[in-house]
Amino acid sequence: MDQLKEAMHYERLEGHKVICRLCPHECTIAPGKFGVCRVRNNIEGTLYTHNYGKISAVAMDPVEKKPLYHFFPGKYVLSLGTVGCNFRCSFCQNHHIAQRGAEEKMGAGALYEASEGYLLSLCRQEEDCIGIAYTYNEPTIWYEYVLETARYIKDKGYKNILVTNGY
């Protein structure tokens, strides 16, 4: 997973520029530059995601910590997040990860890679775990990884929760 992954939802423009269609910012990104989220990068006219499979935070949490009402009370979810965000909130409680890009230094061991199988094994360690919550930062900027992981986890009988800013 150490390699870059080509992003989904973008268009190629003249002059090797691209327009990212993942969020309403619709960033026009010149070669060598990143979008607002700090994780989607134009390399010679192809948009790549730099945070695919890269985890910055993981914890087993009570589902009640999520902004849900009466959703499997008393159960747990594996909460995980990456770096980057399409907002710049001054009050963000996870500023230290949400306002970093995938290429920025965060300290030793701050980002690590996790396969779907590894995440499934973490879910199975807690008997009352019902699934995964993609949280801590904006999960939609992690689109390719969240999509693949969510499908895998669902096929294994687990739930998926996205804690998103909705933009």
Question: How would you label these PLM feature ranges?
Answer:
Residues 1-75:
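Flexible, acidic/Gly-rich N-terminal and inter-domain linker regions that tether
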